[in-house]
Design a protein with these regions (language model features):
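Alpha-helical support elements that line or immediately flank enzyme active sites
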Residues: 58-59, 142-150, 244-249, 508-536
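Active-site rim segments in enzyme catalytic domains, especially the processed small/beta chain
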Residues: 79-95, 99-103, 263-268, 413, ...
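Bacterial N-terminal signal peptides that target proteins for export
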Residues: 2-18
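Internal maturation/activation junctions in enzymes
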Residues: 202, 235, 253, 265, ...
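Bacterial N-terminal signal peptides
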Residues: 16-27
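Extended C-terminal subregions enriched in glycine
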Residues: 437, 484, 517-518, 527-590
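Noncatalytic scaffold domains of N-terminal-nucleophile
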Residues: 32-53, 57, 65-242, 247-299, ...
């Protein structure tokens, strides 16, 4: 009896030791909260169930991924205005199967031609993300109609029908939207049109589940449909062009500009009439057989590519998933990428970015050698990509070169007041779609949201405040310039595997977007056997988040040395990271901002997989 008891004690001790070792090597794989979503014909994942269902409906009616994507952008701009409104921006990547290439559509608005740094400084104004001072031209609708015109098959009337219905007849409000309204109530009450838009006629707030209507927004969309109808006899493209022109060049634009000028914003009609969504080649890198495409250096998207190039120099599988080594090298690679982002990334219409050097594998190898596996870096220093770039030989703007980050109590206080979890107050959504033919639509729309956008009179359009991502600093590459686009955080991603369509992925989360995408992508491709076929497992695994950079949003706070970690990571792993010098804040399960929405084509079966992050109420469907 005594020997049996001793054997049990020894067995328990061995088991405890093994559990501790397993925790240090990586997390345990647990069942996902959401079931596998798989189908043969298509997959959709988006930030709201109504957005997902709108895209799904278009696919069922015979539309392609691009028709469905535009329908989702329009519906999202009605029902997700705590995250994104139609006066905001939409960054899009498309993969038309007949073209066999990825194309980038930059629906990011530009600053008015009269907006200069001196204009703001002389008036003692800043770019705080509320009101009209940080306003830029709405870009989302131009991008949406550009996609529809070039790659879609349906009319604007077809794809806008559900958005008009929800705006005119109403839809039920979700709790998240109510929370945002309550949080932003002071700002809402500053602007009469915002108050009429977001509050009941008696000034009280709606409750979750209540029906809300936006008749002014519905009317704007119907005016665009009327313009299309008047020109549809000239062809589908002519009709779509007429709808777009009515918004940017016609009576809708005139109303918006009159409102802006009345309130002292430096816009004129030409800022709208001459605006265009930029259509261009994306940038890309290859990571172990996967080709990852991102928007060019006007976005933070290439930071993901830089981090992957750095990580290719390490044996991630050998380290073990979510082990201390694995998370440490991810954090450190992101620090290096962010230092380059904050130095070199800017509007390429105004700045010659050393893009070739930044994405060079040789440069990444040099950067990887900066990583000390035993200690967290407390520096914030950009690399020098110029020797690896055949086009750029000189850099005259500010360069990150801070040798030692001191603890800053003011910064620490700001972190506790919202900066500690980037993207929780500023918001965004994402849409990922793959259809039966293999066409892919991937978009990250944002801006025009409740908390910052002024409703422009009876147009129902909430004006984007993305200008807060400029710097009012003439030494910075990403400074404010007339007709320039801010270096934005929005970052869709398309991945090909051996040249074939494989994955579309994106997320909200501000500066954190690349971190969510990076960790989810690595979960999918490096640890495929641990989750397949339930894509939700790869999405739900716990994450970390470094704050070691200048925040893109005004006033560009910093979180140097700070790391967030979800509490579902083993405590031994968190302690091991702390011993290396990472200053960890432990958040609740699913506590890191972001909501990865993903669609995937399984190359071995041809099945379409879809997944949506439980960190918010994103929703996925396949059929």
């Amino acid at each position: 009896m005594r020997e049996t008891a001793q054997r049990i004690i020894r067995s328990r001790a061995i088991l405890t030791s093994l559990l501790a070792v397993a925790c240090l090597l990586g997390t345990f794989v647990t069942a996902a909260q959401r079931p596998p979503i798989m189908g043969r014909n298509g997959g959709v994942s988006a930030g709201h169930p109504l957005t997902t269902s709108a895209a799904f409906e278009v696919l069922l009616r015979g539309g392609n991924a691009f028709d469905a994507g535009v329908a989702a952008l329009l519906v999202g701009g009605v029902v997700e205005q705590d995250l994104y409104g139609l006066g905001g921006e939409a960054l899009v990547l498309v993969y038309p199967i007949n073209e066999r290439k990825v194309t980038s559509i930059t629906g990011q608005g530009w600053a008015p031609k009269n907006a200069t740094i001196d204009w703001y400084l002389q008036r003692d104004r800043d770019l705080m993300g509320q009101g009209l001072d940080p306003a830029v031209v709405p870009g989302a609708l131009h991008a949406a109609l550009t996609v529809l015109e070039r790659w879609g098959t349906l009319s604007f009337e077809d794809v806008s029908a559900r958005a008009i219905e929800y705006a005119e007849q109403g839809f039920p409000l979700r709790s998240r939207t109510i929370t945002t309204i309550e949080r932003e109530i002071e700002f809402i009450k500053e602007w009469p049109d915002n108050q009429r838009y977001w509050l009941r006629p008696d000034g009280t707030t709606y409750q979750a589940g209540d029906t809300i209507k936006f008749p002014s927004l519905a009317n704007t969309l119907k005016l665009m449909v009327d313009a299309e109808r008047a020109n549809i006899s000239k062809g589908r493209v002519a009709g779509i062009t007429a709808a777009r022109d009515r918004f940017y060049k016609g009576d809708i634009a005139q109303k918006m500009v009159e409102f802006l000028q009345h309130h002292g914003a430096p816009f004129d009609q030409s800022d709208f009439a001459e605006f265009y969504a930029r259509v261009e080649d994306p940038v890309h890198t290859n990571y172990r057989g996967y080709t990852i495409y991102k928007q060019p250096f006007n976005s933070q998207g290439p930071a993901l590519l830089q981090a992957l190039n750095i990580l290719e120099n390490f044996d991630l599988q050998g380290m073990g998933h979510n082990s201390a080594d694995y998370l440490h090298v991810i954090i450190e690679s992101l620090k290096l990428a962010y230092a380059d982002r904050d130095t070199y990334y800017a509007d390429q219409d105004f700045v010659t970015v050393p893009a070739e050097g930044l994405l060079s594998k040789a440069y990444a190898k040099e950067r990887a050698q900066k990583i000390d596996m035993a200690a967290a870096s407390r520096t914030f220093t950009a690399g020098n990509p110029l020797p690896f770039d055949s086009q750029v030989t000189d850099w005259t703007y500010w360069t990150a070169d801070i040798d030692e980050m001191a603890d800053d109590q003011a910064t620490h206080d700001r972190e506790q007041d919202g900066f500690n979890n980037l993207g929780s107050l500023k918001d965004t959504t994402h849409i990922a779609i793959i259809d039966a033919e293999g066409n892919i639509f991937d978009s990250t729309p944002s801006g025009g949201w409740i908390g910052g956008a002024v409703i422009l009179g009876d147009t129902g359009i909430g004006m984007s405040v993305r200008g807060e991502q400029f710097w009012l600093d003439k030494t910075r590459a990403a400074q404010l310039r007339p007709r320039s686009r801010p270096r934005y955080t929005l970052t869709p991603s398309i991945v090909l595997k051996d040249g074939e369509p494989f994955l579309a992925i994106g997320t909200p989360g501000g500066d954190n977007q690349e971190q969510t995408i990076l960790q989810t992508f690595l979960n999918i491709v490096e640890f495929h056997a641990d989750w397949y076929p339930n894509l939700h497992e790869a999405i739900e695994w716990p994450r970390v988040q470094t704050l070691h950079f200048y925040q893109s949003f005004w006033p560009h706070d910093t979180g140097f040395n700070q790391v967030n970690a979800e509490s579902t990571l083993p405590s031994q792993v968190i302690r091991a990271l702390e011993r290396r010098g990472h200053e960890i804040t432990t958040l609740q399960p699913f506590g890191i901002s972001g909501c990865a929405t993903v669609v995937m084509l399984a190359s071995d079966t041809g099945n379409r997989l879809a997944g949506a992050d439980p960190r918010r109420d994103c929703y996925a469907i396949a059929y």
